Amino acid sequence: MNVLIHHDQPLEKWREGVMTRMRMSALLGGRQLCIFDQFCDPGLGAPLHIHAVEEVLEVIEGTAEIWLGKKSAIVKPNQSVLVPACAKDGFRNLENTTLHVRATLAAPIFEASYNDTAETSRRWTPNHFDL
């Protein structure tokens, strides 16, 4: 059994105004899940994108506007949104404080397709799987 100490995981600059902390991925031994926390400055978050797998977006602190397809919802702490595989989604911070969102993907690596081709599409991918 491996006990993970999440606050020991480094914060990574995802994009300007958005920091990310990995909780579980292939790099940490996960085989079917990628779980990470994002900390977003006011007005910032994740641009519209698509994952090939299901995702759950949970607001831990703050208030987010989450987009799913052509719909949007205001999501507060202890609320989440299930994003179906291949659905376009994104979110932004609606408050003047830091938004904390936890994302869970049904895959051990992060892969996404963005409208903005400058955005990184793959993260937390080990060089070799030790299967």
Predicted regions and their residues:
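Glycine- and acidic-residue-biased ligand/ion/polar-headgroup-sensing regions
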Residues: E54-E55, V59-A64
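A short hydrophobic beta-strand segment most commonly corresponding to one strand
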Residues: L82, N96-Y114
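A short, N-terminal "cap"/entry segment at the start of jelly-roll beta-barrel domains
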Residues: M1-L33, S113-L131
